[in-house]
């Protein structure tokens, strides 16, 4: 199977607000549209580039919120408007995947689809392409869902975990269980056991199997669409979604489908992966500088500083002394200085407090 296979498609999920990476990621300009590392390509563009090696470029669809559609058009000018799905309200991934898969199915009912977040790093793209193509071949031949798992290198409470069940082939296992963001002590138990892999949130399926599972497990999504509009057109679909999407449940594809389906498998992968959604995960993924500090495209002078991550705007200089294990991040009208450990919970708390006490202009 090659990337010219006419049945292979991709859905890039790019509608999130990225609040775990606040204040660098803001409501008005979330992280997927940022060139966060100063490499010349945004996270969305890098995801598109990566997936265009696996499926034909004109088989890539982008889900995003309507307020971010112009960012997608500017950053991916080769993607046609019919391949950009504009969601009228923020919802979790289950409604997004259902809508994009429906649009793809109307073009090709034999489609095999990769659904991917837009905020991940892959360090071995050749291995990534190999694993993804093997995965697409697997879901083409089997009515199932396939999650891509990566062997954990540390106890990471900010990640999801997949417990391996029975082996069904080389590197392929039935999923025993999913656990989302465990406490650190449980994450250590998972890693030490050798039975758990990180959940990359990359999952593959054939569209017929997805349809069957939505009909059985989450029938409220897309119910009645095919009966109301038996003759497909993008215009009628967009109008229907603008009216009905807000009524869909705010639930992830993991909770709605994958954790409840009986036909979910995991592939052991080794393509070098990191979730770029949190400060701590970015710190762990990045190459460390002097005293294990990570400085991201920023101008900094440090003395007696260890294990920190720093991200500043262009034209700003930070002089830091005596910090150990901190995040120092500034964007526009917000400066964040907080401990790096378990920062996901801290950042979530601060975002909520700031929004309530200071207003949306700081979010």
Regions found by a protein language model. Give the residues of each.
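Short beta-strand segments
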Residues: 12-14, 63, 114-117, 147-151, ...
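Residue-level signal for inorganic ion chemistry
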Residues: 44, 100, 119, 162, ...
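Left-handed beta-helix
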Residues: 2-7, 208-363
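A residue-level structural signature of the nucleotidyltransferase/glycosyltransferase Rossmann-like core
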Residues: 113, 195, 202-203, 274, ...
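Conserved N-terminal catalytic core of the sugar/cofactor nucleotidyltransferase
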Residues: 1-12, 20-27, 38-117, 123-127, ...
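Conserved core of the sugar-phosphate nucleotidyltransferase
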Residues: 125-245, 265, 315, 339-340
């Amino acid at each position: 199977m090659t990337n010219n296979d006419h049945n292979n498609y991709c859905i890039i999920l790019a509608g999130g607000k990225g609040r775990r990476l606040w204040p660098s990621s803001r409501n008005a300009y979330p992280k997927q549209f940022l060139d966060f590392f100063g490499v010349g390509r945004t996270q969305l563009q890098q995801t598109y580039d990566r997936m265009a090696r696996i499926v034909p470029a004109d088989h890539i669809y982008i889900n995003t919120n309507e307020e971010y559609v112009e960012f997608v058009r500017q950053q991916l000018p080769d993607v046609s408007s019919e391949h950009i799905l504009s969601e009228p309200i923020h919802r979790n991934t289950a409604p997004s995947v259902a809508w994009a898969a429906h649009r793809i199915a109307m073009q090709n009912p034999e489609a095999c689809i990769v659904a991917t977040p837009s905020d991940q790093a892959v360090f071995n793209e050749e291995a990534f392409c190999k694993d993804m193509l093997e995965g697409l071949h697997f879901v083409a031949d089997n009515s199932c869902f396939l999650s891509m798992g990566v062997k954990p290198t540390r106890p990471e409470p900010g990640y999801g975990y997949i417990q391996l069940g029975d082996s069904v082939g080389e590197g392929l296992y039935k999923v025993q269980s999913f656990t989302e963001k465990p406490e650190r002590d449980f994450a250590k138990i998972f890693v030490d056991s050798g039975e758990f892999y990180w959940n990359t949130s990359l999952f593959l399926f054939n569209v017929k199997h997805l349809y069957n599972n939505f009909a059985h497990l989450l029938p409220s999504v897309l119910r009645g669409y095919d009966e109301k509009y038996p003759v497909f057109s993008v215009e009628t679909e967009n109008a229907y979604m603008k009216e009905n999407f807000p009524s869909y449940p705010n639930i992830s594809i993991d909770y709605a489908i994958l954790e409840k389906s009986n036909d979910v498998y995991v592939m052991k992968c080794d393509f070098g992966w990191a979730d770029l959604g949190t400060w701590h995960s970015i710190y762990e993924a990045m190459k460390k500088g002097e005293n294990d500090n990570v400085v991201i495209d920023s101008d900094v002078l440090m003395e007696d500083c260890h294990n920190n991550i720093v991200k500043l705007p262009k034209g700003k200089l930070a002089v830091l002394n005596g910090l150990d294990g901190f995040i120092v991040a500034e964007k526009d009208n917000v400066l964040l200085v907080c401990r790096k450990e378990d920062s996901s919970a801290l950042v979530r708390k601060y975002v909520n407090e700031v929004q309530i006490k200071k207003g949306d202009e700081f979010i």
